[in-house]
Swiss-Prot record:
Superkingdom of origin: Eukaryota
Gene3D superfamilies cross-referenced by the UniProt entry: alpha/beta hydrolase (3.40.50.1820)
Note: Fusarium verticillioides possesses 2 unlinked loci, FDB1 and FDB2, necessary for detoxification of antimicrobial compounds produced by maize, including 2-benzoxazolinone (BOA). The FDB2 cluster arose as a duplication of the FDB1 cluster with rearrangement and expansion by incorporating additional genes.
Keywords associated with the record: Hydrolase
Enzyme Commission number(s): 3.1.1.-
Gene knockout outcome: Does not affect tolerance to 2-benzoxazolinone (BOA).
Organism of derivation: Gibberella moniliformis (strain M3125 / FGSC 7600) (Maize ear and stalk rot fungus)
Protein name: Esterase FVEG_12639
InterPro entries: AB_hydrolase_3 (IPR013094), AB_hydrolase_fold (IPR029058), GDXG_lipolytic_enzyme (IPR050300)
Induction per the UniProt record: Expression is induced in response to 2-benzoxasolinone (BOA) exposure.
Species classification: Eukaryota, Fungi, Dikarya, Ascomycota, Pezizomycotina
Amino acid sequence: MVSLDPINAKFAAAIDGLPAPHQLGGPGKAFENLEELQRHEPANDIATQVIKVEGKYGPTSVTLFRSKALVDKPLPMIFYTHGGGWVMGSAKSFAVLVEDLARRTGAAVIFPDYTLAPHQTFPFPFEQSYEVLEYMIRHGKEYNLLVKTIALAGDSVGGHMAIAMMQMSLQRQLPATISQIVLWAPVTVTHKKYPSYTTFKDGPFLPEATMDWMIDTFIPSKSDRETALASPLTHLPDDVLSKFPPTIIFLSTVDPLVDEGVAFGQRLQGLGVDASVIKAEGQMHAFCLVTALRDGPTAQAVLELAALRLRKIFPDSA
């Protein structure tokens, strides 16, 4: 029997009986609910800069997070794609996590506010996010960024998108080297379910029905789900996946996505990729993001390890 640690158990009890995202009355209400849950005063030590990236898929709002102590220095770049089921999430609701990464790594974290479903569906936000990634690489000097070697990071469906960014960068020859990927509970397959969907059918925080609703909203076409972008675990070719850089995958033991995260890590390992899979015992989905959970000892240890792996490729960062 998998159990939650005291911090996660307390939060699970607090939300028990409350409507899940798919029960709130539509994507707009779900978005508002997450924004309220994650209401956060901007950190005093982190500077933010909001820019607009024009282009075929824009304009896209992009927020750059960096330590105020390093604001005048050229900084390495982490490109972060956020979770929220492709229907929720913003630079505001994810600020507490992204600020932490900027603080711990000494890097600039680039956060695209891609268009959420149902306003745009698969694959538009993937193309939109890649457009931002390529723009930041080509215009890095304008924003005091060091872009020769960069990292990708993302959580949940944002991890799904980070995998897509890597795939697209290889196929389209992004003029930069991606040297590290950091993933939290990534979605890696959308056309089938692994056993943990049944094990954690009722959550907490991410029940099976919510995940089903998110996939149906973002990828309504079932044929689209059986593609490399939508289901990299089962459809991304070996010759592409084998070119992935060192990748670390953090998983929660109480999460419907845990099994597909393990399977993706094992597939990377089988192809010779330097891939690490780490399960955080007693944690639920989004334990490094949710304000009520992220100060727990396990979440803090995971964030410390994530930052360590990121700093490893940025030898000149703080």
